[in-house]
A protein has these predicted regions:
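Basic helix-turn-helix/winged-helix DNA-binding cores
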Residues: 1-68
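Short linear sequence elements within intrinsically disordered, low-complexity coil regions
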Residues: 7, 25-26, 44, 71, ...
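A generic structural signal for secondary-structure junctions
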Residues: 52-55, 68-71, 110, 114-117
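Amphipathic alpha-helical dimerization/coiled-coil segments
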Residues: 55-87
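C-terminal regulatory/oligomerization modules of transcriptional regulators
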Residues: 75-146
Length: 146
């Protein structure tokens, strides 16, 4: 069993965040000894899932719903699966958008490196899009995809 301070340190979270999660009902089986929260392996695993879902952009109210479904048992497996599939699709879309942004940055870094070498943008502008070097053409095309 771990104290709230130990868990906060393990996960790199403020103690206030763990208290908030507890108040939101995200640790339904959390034990208390003389008013002190005691985190076991179940809560640590729940916290790993909570942090994953938060990083995936899920709101606390939806995480709470997921945790409630977990306590309801196997009958909620289909709901949980749909929730994760929807979040996965959302993340895949976000990753694609981020990759387009990254490719634009790669292209612009290359573009300005060429402009600096030439002392002008004239030559590099004339290369776009057909005569770009292969190593940068894919980044340009992905960045400009609609």
């Amino acid at each position: 069993m771990y104290t709230i301070g130990q868990v906060a340190e393990m996960f790199g979270l403020p103690v206030s965040t763990l208290r908030y999660y507890d108040k939101q009902g995200l640790f339904p089986g959390l034990e208390r000894a003389s008013g002190i929260r005691r985190f076991g392996d179940t809560e640590l695993e729940a916290l790993r899932v909570i942090e994953c879902l938060k990083k995936a952009g899920m709101e606390i109210k939806d995480i709470r719903l997921f945790m409630e479904w977990c306590t309801e048992g196997p009958s909620t497996y289909p709901k949980r699966k749909v929730m994760f599939e929807e979040r996965k699709a959302h993340m895949e879309s976000e990753i694609a958008n981020m990759n387009r942004a990254l490719d634009m940055l790669k292209f612009k870094c290359w573009y300005y490196e060429q402009a600096i070498q030439d002392g002008s943008e004239d030559r590099v502008k004339a290369l776009i899009p057909d005569d770009l070097p292969e190593e940068i053409k894919g980044a340009y095309e992905n960045a400009h995809a609609r």
